[in-house]
Amino acid sequence: MYPRVMHAVCFLALSLVSYVAVCAETKVATNCLVKSENTHLTCKCSPNNTSSNTGNGSKCHAMCKCRITEPITMLGAYSAWGAGSFVATLIVLLVVFFVIYAREEEKNNTGTEVDQCLAYRSLTRKKLEQHAAKKQNIYERIPYRPSRQKDNSPLIEPTGTDDEEDEDDNV
């Protein structure tokens, strides 16, 4: 997988874990007599359908639940729970995600070492091929000349004697 996809998945998993940590509300069958920072008493009014002949004919029976919310410990202490905490956590993580990759994009715009190395190699290869082609053309234009070795044999073999040359001088 690509590293960006893996990091995005990790950020989403972390946001889900933080959502679970913030929203970890356990319903306890107590009457919330011991008041602490983590206990919340929520009550709802449900009409009681008893056949009583009273004045208004409807009674409200309060149904209360005591909830204990566990404070968040991962991303810092803020007192938000429910869907708001998930959205806030997701926004914070996405901002961090995009800040990290904006910095990484700035580094990549200067060029990575691998790309520079490949570009240098291809340029060097092209220059070497051009140089070899020029040398080939030069060697094709110059006729073949065997190298002269230093041996003590004379270049011109004597065919006659020196007497013939002396005769020409007398004339």
UniProtKB/Swiss-Prot annotation:
Biased composition regions of type Acidic residues, renumbered to the chain: 160-171
Span list, region Disordered: 133-171
Places the protein is found: Virion membrane
Residues the record marks as carrying a glycan: N48, N49, N56, N108
Organism: Human cytomegalovirus (strain AD169)
GO CC term, one of those recorded: virion membrane
Superkingdom field: Viruses
UniProt keyword terms in alphabetical order: Glycoprotein, Membrane, Signal, Transmembrane, Transmembrane helix, Virion
Protein's UniProt name: Protein IRL10
Protein family: Belongs to the HHV-5 RL10 protein family.
Transmembrane regions: 80-100
